[in-house]
Swiss-Prot record:
Protein encoded by which gene: NS
Protein name from the UniProt record: Nuclear export protein
Other remarks in the entry: Average number present in a viral particle is estimated to be 130-200 molecules.
Signal peptide range in chain numbering: none
Chief localization: virion
A Pfam family assignment: Flu_NS2
Length: 121
């Protein structure tokens, strides 16, 4: 994973953890947890692509990797919709900028995961 993406994830997670939303903080904590999970999943897919032949060990280790991949895309779509919703309702510029960056990062990560998964297929 490139260092800009790592710092983008870290920056957004730190900024989101500092935000106090009018709605429940559980919602935001859930988003943060999903961002972290998504980052780890994307990293592991990227590492699998980097190692030649690792696809076979990935299949042996986890025969349901396609199902996991599908679930991750569902999570990404949910996060994108949640971030878009937050963008529509927020009036705070700090929150707006944070959610804009989160949306951009989600779209980039979705594209990277798609690229990794096509290489594994």
């Amino acid at each position: 994973m490139d260092s800009n993406t790592v710092s983008s994830f870290q920056d957004i997670l730190v900024r989101m953890s500092k935000m106090q939303l009018a709605s429940s903080s559980e919602d935001l904590n859930g988003m943060i947890t999903q961002f972290e999970s998504l980052k780890l999943y994307r990293d592991s897919l990227g590492e699998a692509v980097m190692r030649m032949g690792d696809f076979h060990s990935l299949q042996i280790r986890n025969g349901k990797w396609r199902e996991q991949l599908s679930q991750k895309f569902e999570e990404i779509r949910w996060l994108i919709e949640e971030v878009r919703h937050r963008l529509k309702i927020t009036e705070n510029s700090f929150e707006h900028i944070t959610f804009m960056q989160a949306l951009q990062l989600l779209l980039e990560v979705e594209q990277e995961i798609r690229a990794f998964s096509f290489q594994l297929i």
